[in-house]
Amino acid sequence: MEENCEDCMKWEEELYWTHFQTLHFTQLLLPGFHNRLVIPRKFSTHCKRKLPQIVTLKSPSGVTYNVGVEEDDEKTMAFRFGWDKFVKDHSLEENDLLVFKFHGVSEFEVLVFDGQTLCEKPTSYFVRKCGHAEKTKASHTGYEQEEHINSDIDTASAQLPVISPTSTVRVSEGKYPLSGFKKMRRELSNDNLDQKADVEMISAGSNKKALSLAKRAISPDGFLVFMKRSHVVSKCFLTIPYKWCVKNMLITRQEVVMQVDQTKWEMKFNIFGARGSGGISTGWKKFVQDNNLREGDVCVFEPANSETKPLHLNVYIFRGEETERTNNVDPVYTISE
């Protein structure tokens, strides 16, 4: 009789893990939870094949977060990239209890319980993903620009047009509406633009102007890099922020194609460091040399098509200080006084 009961329990457990559409687990927030949350081993063992590298966490408020799932050398799986944003927005504290409901595809519904009262946190139902980004106001333009800063890479939601390659133009802040890339690119005229770039004190002169133009050319899907010595001379390595990588599923070693006008460069993306950051070394030096990149230049990277494999990035180059260029390479974007 006992053997039959044991057999029944094994069968029931197998049925649960293999056929139930929704599965649950709970996790107590222990010290060190801010940047990484371990998934219970039994859950990860049974659901490993079902778990993609990027999952969606759905807050009680309905707000969703894209979070990366990583596996260490001991086969322990954990929420990693993007988890810190979920923690911050929900003001999670040590000893809080979370209940995860897995729908069998890539989404978890999350309930948040207070560790002291053992009741749900009411505030978790009123979370909005809009209050934690660093905001700066451009005094001369009259609009508020939201920026997400990551190391030496900036992304901006405010948009101004990308100027046609190889053109030398004058640019005025605030003269043109914040509309899309393609429409504004058609409407721009080199004759009626007036340069008044005066934003962050990254460097003096043309470098500051190049950065200002690049920030207003970027789309919400892109990122920009202010070229430092490590990018173009010493290490010759391009670091890409892990949040952008997670959003675009650039989380494993893979090929990347960069394009300026009709010319393409094949490169390799690699993961490095404990934080899970990634970047490009193989192929980047060739890109730097062919495009005569220097310190102070600014590059805007825009995904050409998220469905294309390998990932294609269109690159727009804004020249910094007007120094003599070698190799007879014309600037892609220049700034005239």
UniProtKB/Swiss-Prot annotation:
<dbReference type="InterPro" id="IPR003340">
    <property type="entry name" value="B3_DNA-bd"/>
</dbReference>
<keyword id="KW-0238">DNA-binding</keyword>
<feature type="DNA-binding region" description="TF-B3 2">
    <location>
        <begin position="223"/>
        <end position="321"/>
    </location>
</feature>
<protein>
    <recommendedName>
        <fullName>B3 domain-containing protein REM16</fullName>
    </recommendedName>
</protein>
<keyword id="KW-0805">Transcription regulation</keyword>
<dbReference type="InterPro" id="IPR044837">
    <property type="entry name" value="REM16-like"/>
</dbReference>
<dbReference type="GO" id="GO:0000325">
    <property type="term" value="C:plant-type vacuole"/>
</dbReference>
<dbReference type="GO" id="GO:0005634">
    <property type="term" value="C:nucleus"/>
</dbReference>
<dbReference type="InterPro" id="IPR015300">
    <property type="entry name" value="DNA-bd_pseudobarrel_sf"/>
</dbReference>
<dbReference type="Pfam" id="PF02362">
    <property type="entry name" value="B3"/>
</dbReference>
<keyword id="KW-0539">Nucleus</keyword>
<feature type="DNA-binding region" description="TF-B3 1">
    <location>
        <begin position="22"/>
        <end position="116"/>
    </location>
</feature>
<keyword id="KW-0804">Transcription</keyword>
<keyword id="KW-0677">Repeat</keyword>
<dbReference type="GO" id="GO:0003677">
    <property type="term" value="F:DNA binding"/>
</dbReference>
